[in-house]
Amino acid sequence: LKYYSSDRISQYLGNGSCIFVDKNSQLEDLFSNDEAVYFDSADLNDFGKKINYYVDNKNEAKRIAKNGWERGHKSYNEKIVTNYFLDIAINNKPSIEYSWPINQYFL
């Protein structure tokens, strides 16, 4: 399911953790490779390789975590999400440019 993810991803990201995301979620449309680490769940070794790489390269993991934190707080904060709900419920049109696809929710 495109863009499906547990809300834990946003919680970890918002708390400054380096997140590892299955490529099948297609969250690459929302977060770049500089903001999250993507792995291929079809390749049983890929996740382990990436975990080991970032354990050995902590500064790189910290850089990605910082970038993800900044993106999360800039593009997906409580004010923007609340504004989005109000746009759908009341305005029936976007009042700002959102960082996620919106066309299926507006007439």
List each language-model region with its residue ranges.
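Nucleotide-sugar-dependent
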Residues: 1-10, 20-24, 28-29
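A short alpha->beta transition loop at the rim of the catalytic pocket in nucleotide-sugar-dependent
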Residues: 15-17
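Short, flexible active-site loop motifs that bind/organize anionic cofactors or intermediates
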Residues: 2, 36-37, 51, 71
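Conserved acidic donor-binding segment of nucleotide-sugar-dependent glycosyltransferases
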Residues: 6, 37-43, 54-58
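C-terminal amphipathic helix plus adjacent low-complexity
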Residues: 45-107
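An acidic- and aromatic-residue-enriched active-site/binding cleft used to recognize and process polar
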Residues: 24, 41-42, 77-78
